[in-house]
C-alpha cells in the first residue's frame, strides 16, 4: 500500500494529477481543495495517499493535509459513498465544515454537493454522527449557522452565481458573525457579496 508520495508534478488537472517519482508517473485523484494548493508543473509535491484496490484497478487518492485524508477515510465507510464521491464532497467542503455539518445534522448543506442526493446525505449524517467527537478550539470558535432557510438560500444563491462552495461557506460564516444569528436572507446575501467583492 502507498501511504505517501513525493515527487515532481508532471501534469495537473482539476480531478487528477500525475506525480513523477524516480521516473514512474503516478496518477493521483485529488479534491479541488488539494488541487488549488498545488505548485506548478515541474515543482516538487508531497501528498498523503490512500490506495484504493478494486478487482479491476488500483487507484491513488491524494490529500495535502492529514485532516482531509482522515475525513475521506470516514466518508468511504458510509454505505453508497465511494472514493470518487468522497473526493467530490471534499472538493466542496473543508473537513472542519463537514465535521460541523455532521454534528449539527445539516443535510441540506450536503445535498448542495453534486452527486449527493437525499438518501446519501441522510446516510452520511446517520453513519458518521457517532464517529465524530465534539472538537475544541477552532471548531468551537466558529459561529453557529443561521436558520436553515436563510443560510441554505444564501448558500445556494452564491453557488449558482459561480462561487466555489468552500469560498461561499467561508464568506457566509463571516457575514453571520457580523450580522448576528438568523438574519433575513436578503441582508445575509448582501453582506456576503460585499465580503466576496
From Swiss-Prot:
- A Pfam family matched in the record: HHH_5
Report the GO terms under cellular component.
Answer: cytoplasm; Holliday junction helicase complex; Holliday junction resolvase complex
Q: Where is this region: Domain II?
A: 65-143
Chain intervals for the UniProt region annotation (Domain I): 1-64
Q: Which GO terms describe its molecular function?
A: ATP binding; four-way junction DNA binding; four-way junction helicase activity
Annotated keywords: Cytoplasm, DNA damage, DNA recombination, DNA repair, DNA-binding
Region annotated Domain III, chain positions? 146-197
Query: Is the keyword DNA damage in the record?
Result: yes
Q: Mainly resides where?
A: cytoplasm
- InterPro entries referenced in this protein's UniProt entry, alphabetically: DNA_helicase_Holl-junc_RuvA_I, Hlx-hairpin-Hlx_DNA-bd_motif, NA-bd_OB-fold, RuvA, RuvA_2-like, RuvA_C, RuvA_C_sf
- Give the region (Flexible linker) as residue ranges: 144-145
Q: Which GO terms describe its biological process?
A: DNA recombination; DNA repair
What compartments host this protein? Cytoplasm
Identify its protein family: Belongs to the RuvA family.
Quote the entry's note on domains.
Has three domains with a flexible linker between the domains II and III and assumes an 'L' shape. Domain III is highly mobile and contacts RuvB.
- Function summary: The RuvA-RuvB-RuvC complex processes Holliday junction (HJ) DNA during genetic recombination and DNA repair, while the RuvA-RuvB complex plays an important role in the rescue of blocked DNA replication forks via replication fork reversal (RFR). RuvA specifically binds to HJ cruciform DNA, conferring on it an open structure. The RuvB hexamer acts as an ATP-dependent pump, pulling dsDNA into and through the RuvAB complex. HJ branch migration allows RuvC to scan DNA until it finds its consensus sequence, where it cleaves and resolves the cruciform DNA.
HAMAP family on file: DNA_HJ_migration_RuvA (MF_00031)
How does the record describe its quaternary structure?
Answer: Homotetramer. Forms an RuvA(8)-RuvB(12)-Holliday junction (HJ) complex. HJ DNA is sandwiched between 2 RuvA tetramers; dsDNA enters through RuvA and exits via RuvB. An RuvB hexamer assembles on each DNA strand where it exits the tetramer. Each RuvB hexamer is contacted by two RuvA subunits (via domain III) on 2 adjacent RuvB subunits; this complex drives branch migration. In the full resolvosome a probable DNA-RuvA(4)-RuvB(12)-RuvC(2) complex forms which resolves the HJ.
Question: Which named protein is this?
Answer: Holliday junction branch migration complex subunit RuvA
Species this chain originates from: Syntrophobacter fumaroxidans (strain DSM 10017 / MPOB)
**UniProt gene name:** ruvA
Amino acid at each position: 500500500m502507498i501511504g505517501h508520495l513525493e515527487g515532481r508534478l508532471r501534469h495537473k488537472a482539476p480531478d487528477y494529477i500525475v506525480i513523477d517519482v524516480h521516473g514512474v508517473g503516478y496518477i493521483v485523484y485529488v479534491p479541488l481543495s488539494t488541487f488549488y494548493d498545488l505548485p506548478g508543473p515541474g515543482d516538487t509535491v508531497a501528498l498523503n495517499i490512500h490506495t484504493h484496490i478494486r478487482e479491476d484497478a488500483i487507484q491513488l487518492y491524494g490529500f495535502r493535509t492529514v485532516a482531509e485524508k482522515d475525513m475521506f477515510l470516514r466518508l468511504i465507510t458510509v454505505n453508497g459513498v465511494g472514493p470518487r464521491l468522497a473526493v467530490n464532497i471534499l472538493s466542496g467542503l473543508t473537513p472542519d465544515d463537514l465535521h460541523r455539518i455532521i454534528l449539527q445534522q445539516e443535510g441540506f448543506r450536503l445535498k448542495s454537493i453534486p452527486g449527493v442526493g437525499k438518501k446519501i446525505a441522510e446516510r452520511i449524517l446517520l453513519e458518521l454522527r457517532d464517529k465524530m467527537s465534539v472538537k475544541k478550539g477552532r471548531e468551537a470558535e466558529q459561529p453557529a449557522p443561521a436558520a436553515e432557510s436563510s443560510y441554505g438560500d444564501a448558500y445556494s444563491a452564491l453557488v449558482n452565481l459561480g462561487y466555489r462552495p468552500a469560498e461561499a461557506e467561508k464568506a457566509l460564516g463571516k457575514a453571520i458573525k457580523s450580522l448576528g444569528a438568523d438574519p433575513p436572507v436578503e441582508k445575509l446575501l448582501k453582506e456576503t457579496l460585499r465580503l466576496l467583492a
